[in-house]
Amino acid sequence: MNDQLAGLTGEWALWRDCAVRSAGFPVRGLDVFGSDESAGLRAVAGDPAFREAVTWQNREALHNAVDKVAAGSPTGASTRRRREEVVANYWQRYCAKNETIGFFGPLAWGRLADSGPAVAYRAGRVDAQRSVHFEQWAIEALAQSLGLPDPIPLGPHPERDLRIRLQRSPHSDDGLAALDLLESRRSAVAEATRDKLDAALAHLDRTFVELTRQEPWRKPGEAYGARTPVYLDCLRDLQLSVGPGMRDEMAGALPALLASSRWYCDRIFDIGRTLMRDAIGERMASGPTIGRILGELMRIPAQVHAVTAQLQTKWAQLLHANEPQTLVERASQVFASGGPGWPLSVYHSPDVQIAAASALAIEGGDFLSVVGDFHPGANPLCQGMFATRHPDREQFVTAIHTEVGRPIVFLIPPRNVPRMTSRVMPAFTEPTDIHVAATPGACMPDGFPTIDVGRLLIDGEDVVEPTQGIRFPLIELLSSPLFMAAIRTWDPFPTGGHAPRITVGRTVLRRETWNVVASNAPQHPQDLPGWARALGMPRRVFAKSPLEDKPVYIDFTSPILMRTTGRMLRHAAAATPQRPVRFTEMLPTPDQCWLRDDDGDAFTSELRLVCVDLTRRAGTTS
């Protein structure tokens, strides 16, 4: 065990560093829903911090809805309701959801300690450190307008890569002047006060249009996904220490989930290896192409769904067993797996929310640790939004290479992957790693040698780059589609229509959920509260439609949220009539949010933990 790992069990350890994600507005903001909502939402629409948040995300919504609600502009009932729904949708997100964007989803870092209370912290401003960045597409648009067709590498500072290219080009004075101008507009945005931000962004947009002859937005109407030329990142002023008491509590349940994740990833690895060997075995005169094998794996193989069913069956057996062994002991037997897996499957990552009224309540044992999103066979802190803002980036990168091994084979993501931005692009490799471009436009920053996949030859189950003498296992190149298949299909617990909460000790492995076929749900807002009560749903839940990537917060006492929920159900019933909408209890509840700022306001929060499989670390034999 090194200094960067905290022990969990003999097979599992935790990174001492964890990401702390939170909402940017106090959870008490949800009190606006349920009574006299119009007055409450009018106050929200006039709040300077809320207005700034919407300005960063959607200035059209600011002008067409937020401004009108704040002013109480006279209008028909239908238009007023529609505008209030816009305000409500942003407000529920800012108060109830843990994110990593802007000051409405600030990032912080916590530390797992070997002594001290279960949780100790000091919190200040949500936006203690601000930085404004260009979106990748905006800088690429400028590059194209300057006659530089080659793509810009995905990264947190694409303007720097563009500047390097311009400085290498003859007659680049005009290009450098254009970049200087756009950067000056970005600086003005970063320095703008709340009341001047809208104008500063508008000025940047006009300059962008003048320089590129392109519109200053993309994906209009979406709430997520690199829509505007620049974005804001914030670090929260937070010093957080998680003591051994919390870790000891999680050790009674979390390793069972980790064992099942390892088993699941190994089964997916087996599927990928079989597909690879079949493709190699079918070689014709020209031999199989790596691109063809990648194409097979990019589509989630049908066999994965059978493995998911096996995973749920095994968990059902675990949860209904009456043996005297602990859950962790039973899971180690039920999910026994000897590997191997892809290199990064040494990692598994749960998001853990602590449900408690205060840090004092946690120390007194009055808490639940709630497992939320789970990332099998992956380390989400490798994404740029985390990796580039780690307080000790050198130590961060060294830890990954120590645990995974060197060199890491990295398949550069295709540029056309939905939502592939610099914030989600992995940012943990070194120039000495092996970077492979599988598609046109896939590239790395200067100093990171890149190999075109067309230069690679298959030799048995290895890949060879003959001119440089590079050789590595083909399956390592295929690990990216394998772990994406694991993440997209991970669903360990059998659900059915209603699935009760699963609690082991003080650890909640699954919140209570209700899966409702959209076509069977009420379509009218006034019918939804009674329907929910009859099913046993609490007042506050999150709902995930098969048509959406993200869940939304719902309060069944809110007329406005009932209208938006009814619309969601109608759309789902029309588009996917037999697929369920999943409702999940809100846990922690608003009175179980322990993280407070220096004003005493409580915020929703979660710890993004990284678990290390000690049996799979580089240099370890299982």
Label the predicted regions.
Residues 354-621:
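C-terminal structured domains
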Residues 1-404, 588-589, 594-621:
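Type-3 copper protein
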